[in-house]
């Protein structure tokens, strides 16, 4: 069954596979066991995530203070730009926000940032995430996302399966530290 789903996804160019929270936690905690200051004072970029659904965004926002992060940046890819189209529906989080734009929600990616206690409750966490629409669709190869890549100290994500090699080259080009959590089969993927 799982192979059938992956084969269908490959043929349809559906790269929407969300990484489980516990898999992210297990991987990241291994880095912290080795060096508790791995993320201290660092800007983390999550460039291949839908921040409203991503467990990467949730995990790092919930652990922002614990890890001593400087800044968290999470970006998404616009629904209209995806090769695999599904019946996109904005979340209540987005539609209830004053900046919601019916056209931008499908044409533009989103950027979520976290770097301060926006709510004034004395802690920095998921409730302090701020968001806006990107100028473009959120493609990691765009100048807009490259600028964020260059700002980041560490890039962490589960990149689109079909773009794994391009994504890895994109990181290496900028000489950035990175953590890729995903299938070991991604490295062998060919069109």
Specify the residue positions occupied by each region the protein language model found.
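Class I S-adenosyl-L-methionine-dependent methyltransferase catalytic core
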Residues: 1-191
